[in-house]
Amino acid sequence: MRLHRLRARLNAVAFGLLLLLVHGQGPEIVQPEVDTTLGRVRGRQVGVKGTDRLVNVFLGIPFAQPPLGPDRFSAPHPAQPWEGVRDASAAPPMCLQDVESMNNSRFVLNGKQQIFSVSEDCLVLNIYSPAEATAGAGRPVMVWVHGGALITGAATSYDGSALAAYGDVVVVTVQYRLGVLGFFSTGDEHAPGNQGFLDVVAALRWVQGNITPFGGDLNCVTVFGGSAGGSIVSGLVLSPMAAGLFHRAITQSGVITTPGIIESHPWPLAQKITNTLACSSSSPAEMVQCLRQKEGEELVLSKKLKSTIYPLTVDGTVFPKSPKELLKEKPFHSVPFLMGVNNHEFSWLIPRGWGLLDTMEQMSREDMLAISTPVLTSLDVPPEMMPTVIDEYLGSNSDAQAKCLAFQEFMGDVFINVPTVSFSRYLRDSGSPVFFYEFQHRPSSFAKIKPAWVKADHAAEGAFVFGGPFLMDESSRLAFPEATEEEKQLSLTMMAQWTHFARTGDPNSKGLPPWPRFNQAEQYLEINPVPRAGQKFRETRMQFWSETLPSKIQQWHQKQKNRKAQEDL
């Protein structure tokens, strides 16, 4: 009898062990599956801190064919269908880039860095959808375009799970070709340029045809992006190629009118690139053919091209005219727009990436003028007038710290603040609802990596928009587990504002801070733990760039004209 009981007990233990082997010691792993027009995908399910809501995550879904071989430098082609179930549970490779150049991005928040493998076969997107979202549920869709100066970045660096869970939206993060592969242009049919921009357009087309089974509303799509991603988003508003593909837009510290982000005459840069890569030719066709035969790594790892900027191109099709001309003529898509900047844009992250930190700390007037000359030239400021611009910021200050702060303020205005305010005014005057913000909070995590004088650095708001304090995967670049209670609340508020704007075209809702519309009075929201409405953002400086400086330049040109007339007598 005792032997019988022992056998029964051993059998029970064995059965229990079998159950543990089959099911594991934790909850059963859920692998959600969804049918797209191209085939079935299997993702994974994740949790989010502070809520019981689960999120279905699908990574690396192709929206276009791999741009390889003869398709290098070409517009993207629609992805091909697949058989069976495609695994969409692992992070996809980043688009081919110099991984070393991506190191600077670890200083966005707290020193974390996510490096994924790289590949030219990278035209994929990630989807984060609330687990209870069913086909046809009709949740707002938010499509994120990452930044990185158009040369670095990855969709998977932006974990959309917290934003999806707390905002009850479907988040899509997209990848696009970068650097020479994404933006090389000969200015003609052989390499028109803008292929990285067209990748984003192709992703938006894919969303229109496939987002419904993931619980998204194809008639409620918001494009949003930060830094260079913001430049692409604002370009989507101006480009006829993106008509009807989205319904609202958000830019964070970047617009297409930023100096150097778009070029009307790409040929000189094409010559520089091909000369460096031993593909020099007077024939654009031969140039492109030579570049197509190169290994991808050779194109992106050339040390001689390390500091090269690869801009968008005014090609007559994607961008029929320059952005400034399009803004003045108002032929663009009139959609609700939320846009803004941070209060210390050029403080540390960008100067570090540009190798200017040491120079900045010992800045002289001559240094400031030399560094500023290229950008002022691109803004059509005559060399004789450039000292006037420097004096506006530097004044009579001789103190090293004052010069450093003046340089930071100048560069932040030129590259981000002035273009963003100008863009918002054009949108407002076209009749588009516009909501403007200045993010003013210094993340507590900066104490580990940045000097105490750095305030809200470039891209600092991203961790709050994406719910960094609530991300379960603490290795994620925007994960912010050390956030204070005050910062957690700020993140919850910003997620609610961004997603309510995506839902309605207005960031105002019950329980949220009042956010005035950017109209002729130019009111905006100062975002920090105690938000308040502001008016006439940086009024004196904005007036200098929009009125005072143009007037002085006009007077200078008139004097030159009069002098020449006198000399001709």
From Swiss-Prot:
Gene Ontology CC annotations of this record: endoplasmic reticulum lumen
Keyword Signal annotated:
yes
Q: Which UniProt keywords apply?
A: Disulfide bond, Endoplasmic reticulum, Glycoprotein, Hydrolase, Serine esterase, Signal
Q: Where in the cell is it found?
A: Endoplasmic reticulum lumen
What class does this enzyme belong to in the EC scheme? hydrolase
What residues make up the catalytic site? S227 (acyl-ester intermediate), E345 (charge relay system), H458 (charge relay system)
Q: How is it modified after translation?
A: N-glycosylated.
The protein's recorded glycosylation sites are N103
Q: List the disulfide bonds.
A: C95-C122, C279-C290
Known EC number(s)?
3.1.1.1
* Gene Ontology MF terms in the entry: carboxylesterase activity
Which Pfam families does this entry report, sorted A to Z? Answer: COesterase
InterPro entries membership: AB_hydrolase_fold, CarbesteraseB, Carboxylesterase_B_AS, Type-B_Carboxylest/Lipase
Q: Which reaction does it catalyse?
A: a carboxylic ester + H2O = an alcohol + a carboxylate + H(+)
Annotated motif Prevents secretion from ER, positions? 566-569
- Kindly indicate where the leader peptide sits in this chain: 1-24
For the keyword Ribosomal protein, the answer is: no
Q: Which Gene3D superfamilies match?
A: alpha/beta hydrolase
Q: What does this protein do?
A: Involved in the detoxification of xenobiotics and in the activation of ester and amide prodrugs.
In the record, the note on similarity to other proteins reads: Belongs to the type-B carboxylesterase/lipase family.
What's the name of the protein?
A: Carboxylesterase 3
Look up and give the organism this protein is from. Pongo abelii (Sumatran orangutan)
| Highest classification ranks of the organism | Eukaryota, Metazoa, Chordata, Craniata, Vertebrata
